[in-house]
């Protein structure tokens, strides 16, 4: 992440101009919009995994920047440390997630009917299909439901009510491998360790660095070109 404090400060300035200090709940549409802006800014800060006391210092720095007060630290000296901090926090999050993920994958692999592939994916058939199986170069139409280890839904075509269509060789490795083992009309659960999902970078804000992902995938069709 490139040092982007200036952009964030500008956005915060808009929010601060619309909401009084110490405001509890946004009431007007403008206030709700600025509150939403604050939520978006918080997603940019997600990789830092800030504690409440740390967030107070971040808020103080952003407020001073917006109000053009004299900075309390030398930005040239401490600016580069922002990137160092992010890298350290992301690495720590990834290690924590991967450790929990390894235990989760091992448990999933021990369940009846589960099959662990050479890459580390765990595949469990939910419903057998009767059609063909796709090749990695095929385009497929699927319904899927993606969750984290704690059950949090991060993406779901099922919830959207609209199947997804994509080339099988342009998705995460776990999908490329796993969907090839589903026959048309079939449905399987894929447990995907981070190394064959989004890796140590994750896909913020929904997917943490090193996260293990769980998908229920129903293969509806192999799309003919």
Predicted regions, residues:
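Cross-family detector of peptidyl-prolyl cis-trans isomerase
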Residues: 2-4, 20-225
